[in-house]
Amino acid sequence: MRQQPRWKLYLVVLVALGSIYYALPSLLGGNLPSWMPNKVIHQGLDLQGGLYLLYDVKVEEAIKQAGNNMVDSARNLLRKERQRYRGIEQVGADQVVIRLTPNSDTERMLSVLKDELRESKVEHFQPEAQIRLTLGEAEKVEIRKFAVDQAIEIIRNRIDAFGVSEPSIQKQGERRIIVQLPGIKNPDRAKGLIGRTARLDFKLVNEKGDLNRALEGQVPADSELMYEERSANQGGKSAYPLLVFKRTILSGQHIQNAQTTFNEYNEPIVSVKFDAVGGRKFSQITGEHIKERLAIVLDGKVQSAPVIQDKIAGGRATISGSFTREEAHDLAIVLRAGALPAPLVILEERTVGPTLGADSVAQGLNSVLIGGVLVVLFMVLYYKGFGMLANLAVVLNVTILVSLLALMQATLTLPGIAGAVLLLGMAVDANVLIFERIREELRLGKSPLAAIDHGYSKAFSTILDANITTLITAVILYQFGTGPVRGFAVTLSVGLLASMFTAIFVTRVVLAEVVKNRRLKTLSI
């Protein structure tokens, strides 16, 4: 065996000290000195308690909204081209019908619509004197996918603003979303914050329409009946009907920022700031509709409908509605994060209490301790001094695992603890293979250093093959699994790499150093 380079021993010492340094905050917890790293392993939902939610995204509503947008696009195009038509309306979720007049320039209208709305199917029905626009199948597939992906991003932004540490938000299937909120203190508020669509629309009030006839069911075709919540004299809230034009003249997609503030009566309100486009539109709208009422509609409910007194420049508006301070704060959060592209429906809800979480932690730690003690005893009784070396390698393996998970700021779950227990046995198994190989070399009459060298070399390929196949499985679990399964895969992957390092490199360096320094002529395994 060649002389062992000193850098190998230095590397082992450096890795050991570094692992201890980064693992201590996770192992000790509590208030630590400022010079200690602030990265720790976070406990998962099953360990510290919290909220588990499974949502279904109503993607058909996103298609319906796309159809509504198609109405606006077609209307604007025909207005720009100065084309005449009797009416335009949405039929179903994905179709728009334009009713023609005898004077309509049908050919020109078809040409314009086909050029500008290329993703939609444009058809002319002569007997009915109609042009029909239908969303294409490819576009509908894209809308569904975008609705789910955007919902995940918006939920993440809302939760981050709410202040939940280490949330887990994952897509399940084509239209479902799993949300896990460890350690959440107010589940109802969190559910309200996540599930609120937060669609903000500005619409003009139809003050010329007959409200009484609308209440009897005779609503004008261009209007809809909505309700405004106001504070009642005896406390609480009452709903007041309003006849509002269907057309949205400004939407919440132009909101750049939203903050909670207070009005002159010290009541919480939400102040919104529009982007450049929204600011210009808002200024134009308020300038053209002075002395008219502008309804501020949030998720289908009128929050307020003030009279426009003057043109409002500067791109700012306020939303009032008898909010509590908490409600105003949450509304500002959802407006900043943006509206959900489609409503969310809770399919499954589970609340894990902190007591159950504490029991899970205790059981998990007990399993690790019992497994560790049994492994240590077996190795010492069967391999004596070599067993002690293997046990030290296992301790270092666990320390490296904890430090790497802390650096990754990973979330530890019960399956993750199961992965750690599994790794204890796998780490020792590698050492057992090596020690048996060294025994065989010693029986052939080789010197201790030569036996160690050949033993590690011959065991290397077997250990590498076993760990690579397991690592491939862990990668597949991480790629296609969710939540706890991914936690198990992460723990297993990181632990396997640490196990290979300690079994193949660390024990070899330490063993060779001991034999060389003590000038041992024989080895007893």
Curated annotation (Swiss-Prot):
It is a multi-pass membrane protein. The chain crosses the membrane at residues 9-29, 368-388, 392-412, 415-435, 460-480, 487-507. It is found in: Cell inner membrane. GO terms for biological process: intracellular protein transmembrane transport; protein targeting; protein transport by the Sec complex. Pfam families: SecD_1st, SecD_SecF_C, SecDF_P1_head. GO terms for molecular function: protein-transporting ATPase activity. Keywords: Cell inner membrane, Cell membrane, Membrane, Protein transport, Translocation, Transmembrane, Transmembrane helix, Transport. It comes from the Bacteria. GO terms for cellular component: plasma membrane. Its main location: membrane. Gene3D superfamilies: 3.30.1360.200, 3.30.70.3400, Multidrug efflux transporter AcrB transmembrane domain. Part of the Sec protein translocase complex. Interacts with the SecYEG preprotein conducting channel. SecDF uses the proton motive force (PMF) to complete protein translocation after the ATP-dependent function of SecA. This is Protein translocase subunit SecD. The gene is secD.
